[in-house]
């Protein structure tokens, strides 16, 4: 790992490790906390077994994420580690966590991770710390130390934090606070710094990326940001969490005009039927779904479309679900993530009537997966026989290269698996782009052979 700042203070006694649960926004928080602690003289270790303090950065988006977070907390407290709980569960259950698990030494809210060093100092003095602001307001800028994993060539770049929407199923606005954007200058500065560190791909993230700048510039400013970022020498710039309302002509033009902004559209649409979307408190979306998808395909034929969907939402009838399946068949997304509705206390959907049974919801999820697998297989077959630009990220146990083309985002999509004829050290390929012949495809991955390093 590398850190942004070299101004490291005198070494402290505690050895700190981090355990991360949840999304990439949480990951960025973790990287900042690691950087801050290193700057203050703490030894930050990736090996939890060697650490005496573990910071568990938690997720509270859905029940399964909370269960995983609690499992990790209990695992480390049972090992005798001093545990500090950070992130969304600390924000969500700031009064309950320490009562239920008294072994926890401290809590750090989603708007308070910049205080992690002071929290740890207080914990080392024997204090039980509850550092959770009622309303998160902080967002890190390019000046805050951050660890960037030297073994990876992808970095997430947060352009805003928080959300002003109130989707009926979502607890995030209560956990992350209102939207607050960074300035274009701040984002550009960090992007340039990441480029100097050898990062080959940056992924722009926020709760709603297409709403970027509304709070500080008086209007959404993603198009202007993209135009500026396109000048930064990073081969791939990807955008996650784009909403249909924000995909204006200017934003789509920025995708078209920029060589390094990949035509990959991550659109968390959640559903297709107007009745379900209205219940989700997203009534504006139904009329836009069809038109924006058609517009993207028309303007950018090479566009890759990903969406995420919720099935089993209260009141979702059979005809609503059939509408969703027809929607998938009609628009043929490249990638789809599907989740069963999770009732979250504190959200409007928690009290909605007409609950869908778990058995029906599970069957609907399986149905969506089956339909999408067939679509994805057909989409991937298009690449067979073509040459593609691949970023190589690792070596498999079978001595093959594993990487991605622009149409695959890390972690959530497939990979490209390549054989190599040349008798050279495979490590020479890591972090580089290669040209490859694609010879086979399944519903998730592409397979082929390297031609040359680009």
Curated annotation (Swiss-Prot):
One of its GO terms (cellular component) is cytosol. It comes from Prochlorococcus marinus (strain MIT 9301). It comes from the Bacteria. Residues 14-125 form the MTTase N-terminal domain. [4Fe-4S] cluster 2 binds at residues 163, 167, 170. The gene is rimO. PANTHER family: RIBOSOMAL PROTEIN S12 METHYLTHIOTRANSFERASE RIMO, RIBOSOMAL PROTEIN US12 METHYLTHIOTRANSFERASE RIMO. Belongs to the methylthiotransferase family. RimO subfamily. It is found in: Cytoplasm. The keyword Metal-binding applies. This is Ribosomal protein uS12 methylthiotransferase RimO. Residues 381-452 form the TRAM domain.
């Amino acid at each position: 790992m590398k850190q942004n700042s070299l101004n490291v203070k005198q070494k402290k006694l505690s050895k700190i490790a981090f355990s991360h649960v949840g999304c990439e926004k949480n990951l960025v928080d973790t990287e900042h906390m690691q950087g801050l602690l290193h700057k203050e003289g703490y030894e930050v270790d990736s090996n939890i077994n060697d650490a005496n303090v573990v910071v568990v950065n938690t997720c509270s988006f859905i029940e399964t994420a909370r269960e995983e977070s609690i499992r990790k907390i209990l695992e480390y407290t049972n090992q005798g580690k001093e545990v500090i709980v950070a992130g969304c569960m600390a924000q969500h259950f700031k009064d309950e966590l320490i009562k239920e698990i008294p072994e926890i030494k401290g809590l750090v809210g989603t708007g308070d991770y910049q205080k992690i060093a002071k929290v740890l100092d207080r914990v080392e003095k024997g204090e039980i710390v509850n550092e959770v602001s009622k309303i998160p307001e902080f967002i890190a800028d390019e000046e805050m130390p951050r660890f960037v994993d030297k073994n990876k060539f992808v970095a997430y770049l947060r352009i805003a934090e928080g959300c002003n929407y109130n989707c009926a199923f979502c607890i995030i606005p209560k956990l992350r606070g209102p939207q607050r954007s960074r300035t274009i200058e701040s984002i550009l500065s960090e992007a340039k710094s990441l480029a100097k560190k050898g990062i080959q791909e940056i992924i722009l993230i926020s709760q709603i990326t297409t709403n970027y700048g509304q709070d500080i510039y008086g209007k959404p400013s993603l198009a202007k940001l993209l135009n500026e970022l396109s000048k930064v020498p990073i081969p791939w710039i990807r955008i996650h969490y784009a909403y249909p309302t924000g995909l204006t002509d200017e934003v789509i033009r920025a995708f078209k005009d920029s060589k390094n902004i990949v035509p990959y559209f991550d659109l968390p649409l959640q559903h297709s039927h107007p009745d379900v979307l209205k219940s989700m408190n997203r009534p504006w979306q139904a009329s836009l779904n069809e038109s924006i998808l058609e517009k993207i395909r028309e303007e950018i034929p090479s566009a890759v479309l990903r969406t995420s969907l919720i099935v089993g939402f209260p009141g979702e009838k059979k005809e609503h679900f059939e509408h969703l399946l027809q929607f998938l068949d009609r628009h043929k997304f490249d990638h789809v993530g599907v989740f069963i509705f999770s009732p979250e206390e504190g959200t409007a959907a928690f009290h909605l009537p007409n609950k869908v049974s778990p058995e029906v919801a599970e069957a609907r999820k399986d149905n969506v997966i089956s339909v999408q697998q067939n679509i994805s297989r057909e989409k991937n077959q298009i690449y067979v026989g073509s040459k593609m630009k691949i970023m190589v990220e690792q070596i498999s146990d079978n001595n093959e290269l594993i990487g991605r083309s622009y149409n695959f985002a890390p972690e959530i999509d497939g990979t490209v698996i390549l054989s190599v004829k040349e008798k050279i050290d495979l490590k020479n390929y890591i972090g580089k782009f290669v040209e490859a012949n694609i010879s086979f495809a399944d519903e998730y991955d592409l397979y082929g052979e390297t031609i040359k390093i680009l």
